[in-house]
Amino acid sequence: MEEFQVYLELDRSRQHDFLYPLIFREYIYALAYDHGLNSSILVQNXGYDNKSSLLIVKRLITRMYQQNHLIISANDSNKNPFWGYNKNLYSQIISEGLAVSVEIPFSLQLISSLEKAEIIKSYNLRSIHSIFPFFEEKFPYLNYVSDVQIPYPIHLEILIQSLRYWVKDASSFHLLRLFLYEYCNWNSLITPKKRISTFSKRNPXFXLXLYNFYVCEYXSIFLFLRNKSSYLRLTSSGVLFERIYFYAKIXHFVKVFDKDFLSTLWFFKDPFIHYVRYQGKSILASKNTPFLMKKWKYYLIHLWQCHFFVWSQPGKIHINQLSEHSFYFLGYFSNVRINPSVVRSQMLEKSFIMENLMKKLDTIIPIIPLIRSLAKAKFCNILGHPISKPVWADSSDFDIIDRFLQICRNLSHYYNGSSKKKSLYRIKYILRLSCIKTLARKHKSTVRVFLKRLGSELLEEFFTEEEDIFSLIFSRASSTLQKLYRGRIWYLDIFDFHQ
């Protein structure tokens, strides 16, 4: 990215109005495909001349604007090499260029907002593990929680419309609509899910960019009303980007309640509402009665229906007590556990017993989904019994051990924040025995004979527990400090979580 920094220094006052010319710049596609400026930007494809990369993009966009090419039959597309064999390839080229172009102003705004807030170590805030210390601090004092799955729009036109209030470039929106109608035939009111899924797989960066704009629009509206509806100002987080024409956009939503906007917000007064989101899932938690949680629930439903025209079933949003139910978020089952403690006190000649209740957040590893994932990857069966990995048997011993080691380290790195480590030890045992069976299969031997010949200490150095590493580092430290490092450990270098 550093070699392209000179191209990203746009004029701050004009950055919204000049996105369209960026689509015709070579370095945009070099950024999209992570290639050098002088290298080819297209993947290898039979029958394609990769010497005319940007020229073909320009010709393709020009033809899209010609009226006689807006409607092309299937027979013509088979004859024309521009729209025939390489149609999916050209679709991916333009979508990647569009995705990078619309992300540039947001990146500059994000950098500017972090500089104004004097946030130097902003990379620590990006770690998804930074959410769990917030859970540990706030959730033991809350009563109700609701996990909300943000619904996906039924039409990509809704995603494009959300961009109008973030970028003031009419030419870019016109090209976006023309691109979708030209390549994907988005000419029906309701787009089949299969077509959206196929388009998302072929153009992941473009679909993800549109979805992020939709989620950002939803979150900005929600946080705006969260701040306005609370007696206390929100200090722990804020909206990074400026809202545009917000009051005009909510006019249709206000008519639903048939009341004044301020009187509507009066029912949502809740200074103890907490909101956390990652990708398409969000968590709402509150200290007050479930009545206010239901108000927020139906507010979100009406917001999706009236503002984004997305249908959401109220029955899919559940409101549960934290002390009785667990919620699934970022690969953990979390709940609030009550630890009773009895203290005996004596005053003069009288003694009495005091019972104290301590609330603590528990984070538990979902062992059954993890075993299913390992079984799907052929590391074990559905019951959790380790099996060999025959696909890796052709590799060298070092490569086999290194592959298993990398998976084991990643799981240990992510799930070291669990309150109960027994499930993590079971996952490590499955991977360890699967590695041994794979090595024994390669050498055409049994596990017992293989371990007897090479020794059971063969894999000890590859599967060293992180707790043992900490105990070696702090061998001379106090026992309290050693217990601290044997507990939950959250890392600030985990930026992504794959479901």
Swiss-Prot record:
Protein biosynthesis recorded as keyword: no
GO MF, one annotated term: RNA binding
One GO CC annotation: chloroplast
GO biological-process terms attached to the record: mRNA processing; RNA splicing; tRNA processing
Gene field: matK
Function: Usually encoded in the trnK tRNA gene intron. Probably assists in splicing its own and other chloroplast group II introns.
Similarity comment text for this entry: Belongs to the intron maturase 2 family. MatK subfamily.
Record protein name field: Maturase K
Subcellular location: Plastid, Chloroplast
UniProt keyword terms in alphabetical order: Chloroplast, mRNA processing, Plastid, RNA-binding, tRNA processing
Keyword Iron: no
InterPro entries reported for this sequence: Domain_X, Maturase_MatK, Maturase_MatK_N
